[in-house]
Amino acid sequence: MRIEELDAEAAERELPALAAIMRACVEGGASVNFVLPFTQADSEAWWRRAVLPALRDGERRLLVARVEGRILGTVQLAFAPQPNQPHRAEVTKLLVHPDGRRLGLGRALMTRLEEMARASGRRLLILDTVEGSAAQRLYESLGWTLLGVVPRFALSTDRTVLGGSAFFWNELR
């Protein structure tokens, strides 16, 4: 496994792989702001619209996890835009392709992301995830603090359930 940072140009070259990870995760029920149907084209459009410009502008950083050269995981660090919060960032879109599960990719991505945040002068990180999910258990095992759960926060990908979202914070030392 290799964790690496992609800039906007590298991310654009890897767009099909990044979009495939997101599509596979959404199809598998991951609540990452999308509902079914969710196509490869939908995923690529989101990456082009939301991520690539933010990478170019320095508002976001992107990590990927490769296994035998194949990108199987990704996570993003979005810097707080508020002038009074230069110490804060949000962790977004921790995604691991089903083919990469149970290999420690999520943990490795989060560990590297925290190192990257520290090096960028960020000391307070926030994130949210589906209540009761494997991601929630991962964040708890990494020492993140549960702020609370907002009930009925977001629809499931199949639009049948309004599920709770667990909000976490982590003060980096």
What are these regions (language model features)?
Residues 4-93, 97, 110-112, 116, ...:
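Acetyl-CoA-dependent GNAT
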